[in-house]
Amino acid sequence: MILQNFVVLEGGDGTGTSTQLQILQKRLSGEGGVPTYLRQGAKGGDLNTAWHIPGEGAFPQQARLPTTHFTFEPTDGPIGRLIRQALHRSPALHPTTIAHLFAADRHEHLYGESGIAERCQRGELVICDRYVPSSLVYQGLSCGDDTPAFLNSRFPYPELILFFELDPEIAEQRYRKRDTQDMFEHLAFQKRVHEAYERILPAYCAHGTTLVRIDASLSIEEVAEQVWRALQNLPIFKG
């Protein structure tokens, strides 16, 4: 089943999905915000986003800006917080346990009170940083394809997936600037992630999801424009 009005941002680590979600949140607020970017050197070039709010007509306003909810997975709910702790704990939880936790977090995210499904069905746009494809890729690489495929088989397909494409070596360079250490860090793993995405995404197209590939090697501004153009093709913007 396709869940209309549901948009998902997907890509390997370091491809910029979280940054673009923040940009969309400001742009769809209806304030006419135009992003400017400040690079802070304290942590080796971490990117922080600042916003300049100019006067009327700074960029073309849409005839209709839909009510939009921005979210991410794992969520900041109880199960999502447990996942974040588990990914950084020692000893690590069994990979199959992690896969079950992601599926439980996603079920609540979709069907809990004021969840994704409820919002989409009442005509709101929901934009989510990561969804089922991330589980099929990451948990598939850690515990095999069968378990995450089964756990996520009943969840709806999004109307649109924006896949952020980036050479794994460039993505790894970006990711290392965060100065973090976790199980998803190494370049060889990132190459496997990229290959796994290429393997699973065609199935979404076969089920009716629109897939738009975003060139994440471009500047943040150029990537943001690609994302914005893709969103404008959704029926909810033309209603």
Place the predicted regions along the sequence by residue.
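Extreme N-terminal, non-catalytic leader segments
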Residues: 1-6, 37-47
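NTP-dependent small-molecule kinase module
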Residues: 1-2, 22-27, 31, 37, ...
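The start of beta-strands in P-loop NTPase/AAA+ ATPase cores
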Residues: 5, 124-125, 160
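Hydrophobic anchor at the beta1->P-loop junction of P-loop NTPases
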Residues: 9
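P-loop (Walker A) phosphate-binding loop of NTP-binding proteins
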Residues: 12
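Conserved lysine of the Walker
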Residues: 17
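ATP-dependent small-molecule kinase phosphotransfer cores
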Residues: 43-149
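A glycine- and Lys/Arg-enriched "phosphate-lid" helix/loop adjacent to the NTP-binding pocket
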Residues: 130-196
